[in-house]
Amino acid sequence: MDLNAVRQERQKWMTWKNIAPLRDALSQLPQIDSDVELGNTVALRSQETVNVSELERIARLMMPWRKGPFDLFGLFIDTEWRSDLKYNFLRPHFNLSGKKVADIGCNNGYYMFRFLEDSPAKVVGFDPSALFKSQFDLINHYVKSDIVYELLGVEHLPFY
């Protein structure tokens, strides 16, 4: 299987009529210096002025938010699932330090951002959803992580 061909085809998903407005909104986001607090809530903070009402508008365009919670400069995104509870339950049982970590079905990347607390060598997420990728891109625009998000499904893993 040619994964590059699959990636190119999946990139076209970003032009779908329900996704294109999200991608346009993401392209308009300002570059600001921000800090990330990785706790139960993946929280972003900045000394710079942030247009929180514009962030809320964009976040609402991206609903539903399944995994989280997130706090974007004071805008709390209360997600459908309390992913922090599951993560906190499992975290004592793994060591990610220096390891390559894959998140299969990564959704918006909540767990991948939490993984950063443990300094893994590399984090790669797999999820074939243009909406979830857009949510991830919103958060990562400010986190500025090296996380790799692949618009690939479980069926592509043997070829990765």
Residue ranges and their predicted role:
Residues A121-H156:
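Class I SAM-dependent methyltransferase SAM/SAH-binding core
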Residues N108-S119:
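Conserved SAM-binding loop of SAM-dependent methyltransferases across substrates and taxa
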Residues F70-D84:
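Class I SAM-dependent methyltransferase Rossmann-like catalytic core
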